[in-house]
Structures are given as C-alpha cells and as structure tokens.
C-alpha cells in the first residue's frame, strides 16, 4: 500500500476507534440510567458513524476480526439507551464483552497497519 494512503488509513482507523470509545461511554450512561434525549440522539449518531465508517475501512483493508456481522449485530442490538438501561446484568455484560472483543480486534488491525507503515518508511529511505 502506498505510504500516503497507509497514513490516511491509520488516521481513519484511529478516529474510528475514538467513536468506539464514545459508544462505550454511552453504554456506561445506560448502565447508570443517567441519560437524556440529547444523549439518545448522540448515541444514534455515533452508531450511524460507526456503521458508515466500517464500510469505508472494509473497502480499504481486508480483515476478518472483527467481522462486519459482529459489528452490525452489536450496533443493531443496542437500539437505544433506554433499551440498554432495561437489560438485565448478564445481558449487559454480554454486550460489554462484545464491545471489548470488537475494540481489541480493531486495535490489532491498527497495530498491523502501523507495522506496515514502519516497514514502508524504512524501505523508502
């Protein structure tokens, strides 16, 4: 992959990971039941960005973990903060575990791209 495109992809995935952190923030709000309508609106926006950006990342780099289906299942299952706040503890922990698995998978992809970036930088000199 061209060095400039690799740099752009790394920045894109870093930004994507920040959105995943925001998603986790909203999970915390749902768990504590401390959220309002604006939080609900922002949660929907974060989910939209996560779904759209996933497609852009998939078009640029191949990976199997996390799978598109896993990401869509998590986003689709988290319909609203109100819904999440009503989940029993076991179901909520399962949701958090799904989030963590996806987040770690994305971090791994980012790490692999940074290795490529370093190798590309070394070969360019």
Task: Please state what every model-predicted region is.
Residues 1-125:
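Conserved non-transmembrane functional hotspots
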């Amino acid at each position: 992959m061209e060095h400039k495109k690799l740099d752009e992809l790394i920045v894109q995935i870093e930004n994507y990971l920040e959105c995943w952190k925001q998603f986790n923030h909203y999970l915390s709000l749902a768990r504590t039941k401390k959220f309002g309508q604006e939080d609900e609106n922002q949660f929907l926006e974060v989910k939209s960005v996560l779904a759209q950006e996933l497609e852009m990342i998939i078009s640029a780099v191949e990976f199997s973990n996390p799978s598109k289906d896993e990401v869509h299942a998590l986003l689709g299952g988290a319909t609203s903060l109100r819904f999440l706040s009503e989940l029993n503890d076991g179901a909520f922990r399962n949701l958090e575990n799904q989030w963590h698995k996806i987040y770690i998978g994305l971090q791994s992809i980012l790490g692999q791209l940074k290795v490529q970036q370093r190798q590309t930088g070394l070969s360019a000199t």
